[in-house]
Structure formats: C-alpha cells, structure tokens
C-alpha cells in the first residue's frame, strides 16, 4: 500500500526528477561533463568517429529569437530593405542629396503629438518634413487647428515641443536641424498658455 502511494504522489518539479529515486539522478550527466567529453572527442554516441560534420564546415546558422509579438522582425526587415533601396538610389543618382533622399535618410524620428482638448495622440515622423511650414501643414491635416476656415481660432494655438532636457519651448525658435535633433514631444497648446 505504501509503494502504491509513492507512485501516485504528485510532486512539484520536472518529470523524472524525483527526490527519492537515486537511479534517475545517476543516469543524467551534468552540462560540464558533457562539454568536457565533447571537447575531448568522446561523445556519448561513439566518440570522434561518430561526427558527421567536417572540421572545416561552419556550424548550422542559429535561428534568431524574436520577442512577442513578432512585429520586431517584420519592422527590422522592412527597414533594412528600404534603407538598402535608398542607398542604391542615392548611388545611382550621383550621390546628390535630393528632397526625397533627405526624407528617407536614416530611420524615422517619430515623436508624439498632443493637442489641448483632443482626446487622442498622434505620432509624426519629423524627418518627413523639410521645415516648420511643412510640419505645421501636416499638423493642420491631423488636428484641423490651423486651417484657413477657422482663421479666428488659428491664432489661439501654438506649437511647442519638449526637448531632451524636458523643457517646453516654442517651435520655430531654433533652426530646423537643431529642432529635429532635440525634439522629444510636440504639443499644440492654446495661445493663452503659450505666453
């Protein structure tokens, strides 16, 4: 009766790793002994002669582990293909930097854009725009706050940005390249708050 209760006992742990059974523990080898035996050429299946791989052959390529969700590999392959096609196009055109080449150079510089009173945020790629005028037109298309129809309310909004230090500054006060390198967040705020 006691022997039957031991067989049906539930344990926490991996199957076959019972504490009372010394036979199963003796059959397993530690990782260090496995590495030592493979290095010396005495593998468990017949020694050095059992190896099918030639000494000069490279080992099998490792499969790259991707986190969950597997969006990272898709984005990485998309970025690599677009950057290689951009580089090939730049070499084909003589290396001169065109407007399209400037827009596609490097990765995207996405920043969050929030507007006072809007219950949603958007992200924009600052490298897509050549200056403040293009950025303002894009923000108008997203939020509709600077449109000509609402010319009276257009003066009530100002574009501010948060820089690397966390300071809130008005967009347009610094040159465009400096703005791109230091901008971390965009905020469309009411003109009364901007002053």
UniProtKB/Swiss-Prot annotation:
Belongs to the Aux/IAA family. The keyword Lipid metabolism does not apply. Highly expressed in flowers. Expressed in etiolated seedlings. Pfam families: AUX_IAA (PF02309). GO terms for biological process: auxin-activated signaling pathway; regulation of DNA-templated transcription; response to auxin. GO terms for cellular component: nucleus. It comes from Oryza sativa subsp. japonica (Rice). This is Auxin-responsive protein IAA14. Aux/IAA proteins are short-lived transcriptional factors that function as repressors of early auxin response genes at low auxin concentrations. Homodimers and heterodimers. Keywords: Auxin signaling pathway, Nucleus, Repressor, Transcription, Transcription regulation. Its main location: nucleus. Residues 108-191 form the PB1 domain. It comes from the Eukaryota. Induction: By auxin. PANTHER family: AUXIN-RESPONSIVE PROTEIN IAA14, AUXIN-RESPONSIVE PROTEIN IAA17. InterPro entries: AUX/IAA_dom, AUX_IAA, PB1-like. It is found in: Nucleus. Residues 1-61, 85-107 are annotated as: Disordered.
């Amino acid at each position: 009766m006691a022997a039957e209760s031991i067989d049906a006992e539930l344990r926490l742990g991996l199957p076959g790793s019972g504490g009372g059974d010394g036979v199963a523990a003796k059959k397993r080898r530690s990782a260090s002994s496995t590495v030592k035996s493979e290095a010396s050429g005495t593998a468990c299946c017949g020694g050095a002669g059992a190896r099918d791989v030639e000494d000069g052959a490279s080992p099998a390529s490792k499969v790259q582990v991707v986190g969950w969700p597997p969006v990272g590999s898709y984005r990485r392959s998309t970025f690599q293909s677009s950057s290689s096609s951009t580089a090939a196009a730049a070499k084909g055109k003589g290396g001169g930097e065109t407007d399209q080449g400037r827009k596609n150079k490097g990765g995207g510089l996405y920043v969050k854009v929030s507007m006072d009173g809007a219950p949603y945020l958007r992200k924009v790629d600052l490298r897509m725009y050549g200056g403040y005028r293009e950025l303002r037109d894009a923000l108008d298309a997203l939020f509709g706050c600077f449109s000509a129809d609402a010319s009276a309310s257009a003066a009530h909004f100002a574009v501010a940005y948060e820089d690397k230090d966390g300071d809130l500054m008005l967009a347009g006060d610094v040159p465009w390249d400096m703005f791109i390198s230091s901008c971390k967040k965009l905020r469309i705020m009411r003109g009364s708050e901007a002053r």
